[in-house]
Amino acid sequence: MNFKLFGKSAPGGKTTETAQRTILTYSLSDKGGKQINDDTAAIFRNGGNVRVFVGDGLGGYAGGKQASEAAAKALKAACRGNMHTDAQLIQAAADANRAVFDLQKRTGGKMKTTMVFLSLEKDTARWMHVGDTRLYIFKDGVRVFQTADHSVSYMAVLMGEITMDQIRFHEDRNRVLRALGGENAKPELSAPRTLEDGEYTFLMCTDGFWEYVKEDEMERTLAESKTPEEWILAMEKILLTRVTTDNDNYTAAAVFCR
């Protein structure tokens, strides 16, 4: 199964048309109540392939911003080739991690970044993530998968101490256990997922976004939206009714496979 690509949101994005499927993308990133936006969203295209990166930089004083941008730049370079096998994904993650470490050496800082990365090639999706930036997958409008956070609060969920919904405002929600540029930067890789008949939707978002938009609201607004731009903006409206004046940066990227 081939894809028809329609890219509205990525700056400089191209439109490539093949057969059978249409891919629409959109991304949004906002500094929220902070002075600096440490998040980065990037959408890459290579022929008929689409790759999406979302990262949440850690470190403050613009260091987090530099880290997430460095990781995105390294992954963009890696995306010039195929990104289908475990070895290719692991190497791409290693390149991104090295870029953050090189940044630390040059600046003397301790900046890090979380990451979620999605690769769509032909009829196959693969992804990897580090930290608490999430990927959600919806099939025909129903959530069928989400990544597991690498965080202290998610460990509390696994131990039965709190529920998944309580993770949103848990006292340890900002303590990530894995990050690029950190001691543990090992990505969690997915197995290849074949996109069978039906409509697939992918949402990648930082904690500043998913903390304020619940999964049932993601499904409801998805059902009411014709494009990824409509969907993300509908979810942002929900977010803006709930955030405080000093809320975190928030970033989301969506892919519609139709």
PLM feature segments, named:
Residues 1-258:
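PP2C/PPM-type serine/threonine phosphatase catalytic domain
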